[in-house]
UniProtKB/Swiss-Prot annotation:
The active site is at residues 70, 480. It is an enzyme of class 3 (hydrolase). GO terms for molecular function: xyloglucan-specific endo-beta-1,4-glucanase activity. Hydrolyzes the glucosidic bonds of unbranched Glc residues in tamarind seed xyloglucan, producing XXXG, XLXG, XXLG and XLLG. Has low activity on carboxymethylcellulose, lichenan,hydroxyethylcellulose and glucuronoxylan, and no activity on xylan, polygalaturonic acid, wheat arabinoxylan, rhamnogalacturan, curdlan, laminarin, galactomannan, galactan, arabinan and pachyman or amorphous cellulose. Belongs to the glycosyl hydrolase 74 family. Optimum pH is 6.4 with tamarind seed xyloglucan as substrate. Retains 50% of its activity between pH 5.7 and 7.8. This is Xyloglucanase Xgh74A. Residues 771-841 form the Dockerin domain. Its EC number is 3.2.1.-. It comes from Acetivibrio thermocellus (Hungateiclostridium thermocellum). The gene is xghA. Residues 1-32 form the signal peptide.
Amino acid sequence: MVKKFTSKIKAAVFAAVVAATAIFGPAISSQAVTSVPYKWDNVVIGGGGGFMPGIVFNETEKDLIYARADIGGAYRWDPSTETWIPLLDHFQMDEYSYYGVESIATDPVDPNRVYIVAGMYTNDWLPNMGAILRSTDRGETWEKTILPFKMGGNMPGRSMGERLAIDPNDNRILYLGTRCGNGLWRSTDYGVTWSKVESFPNPGTYIYDPNFDYTKDIIGVVWVVFDKSSSTPGNPTKTIYVGVADKNESIYRSTDGGVTWKAVPGQPKGLLPHHGVLASNGMLYITYGDTCGPYDGNGKGQVWKFNTRTGEWIDITPIPYSSSDNRFCFAGLAVDRQNPDIIMVTSMNAWWPDEYIFRSTDGGATWKNIWEWGMYPERILHYEIDISAAPWLDWGTEKQLPEINPKLGWMIGDIEIDPFNSDRMMYVTGATIYGCDNLTDWDRGGKVKIEVKATGIEECAVLDLVSPPEGAPLVSAVGDLVGFVHDDLKVGPKKMHVPSYSSGTGIDYAELVPNFMALVAKADLYDVKKISFSYDGGRNWFQPPNEAPNSVGGGSVAVAADAKSVIWTPENASPAVTTDNGNSWKVCTNLGMGAVVASDRVNGKKFYAFYNGKFYISTDGGLTFTDTKAPQLPKSVNKIKAVPGKEGHVWLAAREGGLWRSTDGGYTFEKLSNVDTAHVVGFGKAAPGQDYMAIYITGKIDNVLGFFRSDDAGKTWVRINDDEHGYGAVDTAITGDPRVYGRVYIATNGRGIVYGEPASDEPVPTPPQVDKGLVGDLNGDNRINSTDLTLMKRYILKSIEDLPVEDDLWAADINGDGKINSTDYTYLKKYLLQAIPELPKK
């Protein structure tokens, strides 16, 4: 999985300054915004859903564990529930960069203290400088120190570390390894102020790839380790080791408390040090690799230990460097604090047939891998894996031996053994955190029981949301995970939409036929069609024979209210329309690349578009678009949304250009005067006594960032979040629930899907699901028999015009392709003859 591509695009969009138009149309008066109490939570996807580059155990307090996300903030482990608690949800849109956590340090002297190095990108995608976040109550509250440089929580090399370290003898002192040639920094006042360690000789030289903006910066100083035995409590530690991303000299040491530094003599060269751990026996263990990760692990790797007492370097690589089997970086590194000779290391993206997790109980003299070869293609596994907490982790696919599914993971940049419990281990992957509670069974010939250890972490980059008027309350399109049908907001879904996709980028449904949906996506395989259709609310999907012209996939999609046409706007291509579920396509007349398109939610013939500063309407199902000549429009638009039940009512979210509405199909627009910024707009069930749907936006009103609701068509607004619930980047999608007043769903870039409901003692009911009956039961008697086959035949031959059931298409479209024809008749006949065990559509 190519993780976080979507978040990089997000950052580029976020950084763009949208110029507000200087002349506005007739203003809609808005009163000063007030706040109403809401309760907020995640729509559970489960399993994490993203890359968590690091896990940090406190060395002096049991069960005090932190995890850091590359775009989703930081978490603390709750041992009473065995779930993770998010710690940075208070950051709003303007501080989205702080959800990129570069490093975490938990204080071994005062466990209440915890520090975070925050900052997502070192390039120009986001304006924020890096920051040190300081807490004296385990992350319940934070103070902030702005650094004079940027950090890169979502940059190459982010699983190396930890870059931030606390002196175990004098916890006033912290060291920070930086990027971009900024070197090593130090604080002597609990992280409040910082100064550069001018005597440190090497800020790093390694650059992943100088040809691209995302990869052109120096990776820098990547980890700091203190030798606690070199001093006494209350006095600064004298001996400090620092790892630098430099293939010539990468390990440095100070023996005078950081005053002077020298490269450690005799060290290996030609590789990068991913992690360094100093064991109680004086051995400094280090994992090395050709590259910094986390996406690739190409090349070779090594594992070394340095005897800090004798100065001897010992190569303990599990697979000899000269072997052709040594084809990946060694990244993750763990040492058992109960026994310094027990160490574990991981491969970085070996991929085939799976990752490698090595364990040694004799200081690296011998190793065991968590699997070994049997009679090819069989492998002998020393583990079992349980993904019941996030069943979608099987990716909906089956593997051929020697590969199996689910895999051990990928991007395993960190592995940790609990310092208080030698049986507990956790490691990171590109999609979740795995772990076990019986690690030492492996040493006795037993199997390690690996399971998902990411409950509470929701780290997806969510790209689109719909809440249809029937069926599941929510259906999503998700970066890297494609997307899901969310039947229960508090229980994670079992499967993703289309396993052959890599990311879902857009989704829509037909307002008058809400079971019909279209999904557009990215895919790594060339022959996969990057649009799919569903006739059962997203539970089953089929791909058409053809794609839109010049499509590379992705982009957005708009479905006609009557389901008779679909417009796909692929990434870097012009919008195109299909009226036959993708059998044929026609480029929409008068629109081009970059157009924003939406459908009217009443009239199936109408679509709307914003393109090159002009507003367009189509009245022929999307074939032809005409400039409405609407005056005084914003210069650009992020989202267009039309109002269900109100033909011609169109709203534009124009970021800094504000919020606009039209009631005549886009021929004229009005700008809401006191909505300063509107990133996205959506609609939900109308308030009691109102005939206009509730309107939801993320943006800024009266110079206050937040989420807002209007119950009176935009005349007045209330803020529905508070300063503790900002969730960072919330400019991708928002929708109210058409069945539950007050409920709103918001897509975030790194904190999954969040939803809010009015705070009250009475729970907001989840709408009952409509039982549409059995597929194949055409007469509604809850049985599938020869009577249904006869009805099917008569219907296909047009002897009858309608079937006895309420939803003909649901019951008779046996294979889910959106049509009722002889193919469905054949499937039903085979099923009744027991030639097939089940029908294709569930």
